Every structure is written in C-alpha cells, then in structure tokens.
From Swiss-Prot:
PANTHER family: PHOTOSYSTEM I ASSEMBLY PROTEIN YCF4, PTHR33288. The gene is ycf4. It is a multi-pass membrane protein. It comes from Olimarabidopsis pumila. GO terms for biological process: photosynthesis. Seems to be required for the assembly of the photosystem I complex. It is found in: Plastid, Chloroplast thylakoid membrane. The lineage of its organism: Eukaryota, Viridiplantae, Streptophyta, Embryophyta, Tracheophyta. The chain crosses the membrane at residues 22-42, 57-77. This is Photosystem I assembly protein Ycf4. GO terms for cellular component: chloroplast thylakoid membrane; photosystem I.
Length: 184
C-alpha cells in the first residue's frame, strides 16, 4: 500500500502481521501441544488424549522425544506469536522531494533498537537496484543504493512480486527520485 503526491511518496510496509504467519503460528502451536500431551500421557500412564492409548507409546524413548518436540515447538510458536504481536518489520518508506530527504522507519524487537529510523538526503541516492534470481527459489528484491552506506532493501524478500511488478515499482520510484536503475 502506498500514498503519493507530487512531492511526497509514502510506501507502507506490512511486517509480520500476514495471514501466512498467523496460519503457521496457529498450526505450530496445535501440533506442538499435541506432541507434548502425548508425551505427558505416556509419562503418566493414562490417557490425556483419547486418540492414543497410553500403553502404545513407551515413555523411554518415544515419550521423551515427543515431549521434547512439543516443548521446542511451543517455544517456536511463542516466538512467532511475539513477532506478530510486536509487528516486527512493519513501517514505512517516506520520500520527500520538497525537503530532499528520505526517511525509512521499521519496527524491531523490544529493546534499545525497537525503532529503526534511517534518514538520507536524496542527493546521496546513487540508484535504484533490482536483483532478480530465477530458479527453484526465485528471489526478486528492490534496493536503494546510498553513497557511502551501501544498498538498503526496500521490499521484503518473502513478498512474491512478479518480475514485471518489481520492474514497474523500480521504474516509478527511479522516476520520482530522478535516479538511474541498475539490474543484477
């Protein structure tokens, strides 16, 4: 999603609150909870879940391994839910031609660097760079080359844009910023 006028362009970044992240966190939570309950029922010797008789799963080694997988899965699920709650990776890219400044803001993990804020002068932007890697794990990324700073990614690598959409976005941004486009 973006907002644009003659002198200002704001590009809003989604972050971790995507449908796929909600689905993965929910599936991982349910699966790991199931593993933990099966491991616990094998330890107690009675059915916590009525799907599996506790006599079929011996605590050592199957019950221990299932309990370990359940606990590990719950930790990973907790991590995913925290990134969704904190909305890690969301923010905006603001390009202001009137002031000649580019502002990039992202939310991070809680702590000293929770708010990630970068500011550049437009005159320091060398180019807009497109990096396209086709194949099994196709990757299309849009970068902004800053003099003395290197390349800053403007689009997340997990967003599935087609090559045409990336090229269109790069062309519009390069035209707005009045800088050349590089393709790698």
């Amino acid at each position: 999603m973006s907002w644009r006028s003659e002198s200002i362009w704001i590009e809003f970044i989604t972050g971790s609150r995507k449908t796929s992240n909600f689905c993965w966190a929910f599936i991982l939570f349910l699966g790991s909870l199931g593993f933990l309950l099966v491991g616990t029922s094998s330890y107690l010797g009675r059915n916590v879940i009525s799907l599996f008789p506790s006599q079929e799963i011996i605590f050592f080694p199957q019950g221990i391994v299932m309990s370990f997988y359940g606990i590990a899965g719950l930790f990973i699920s907790c991590y995913l839910w925290c990134t969704i709650l904190w909305n890690v990776g969301s923010g905006y890219d603001l390009f202001d031609r009137k002031e000649g400044i580019v502002r990039i803001f992202r939310w991070g993990f809680p702590g000293k660097s929770r708010r990630i804020f970068l500011r550049f002068f437009m005159k320091d932007i060398q180019s807009i760079r497109i990096e396209v890697k086709e194949g099994v794990s196709a990757r299309r990324v849009l970068y902004m080359e800053i003099r003395g700073q290197g390349a800053i990614p403007l689009i997340r690598t997990d967003e599935n844009f087609t090559t045409r959409e990336i090229e269109q976005k790069a062309a519009e941004l390069a035209y707005f910023l009045r800088v050349p486009i590089e393709v790698f």
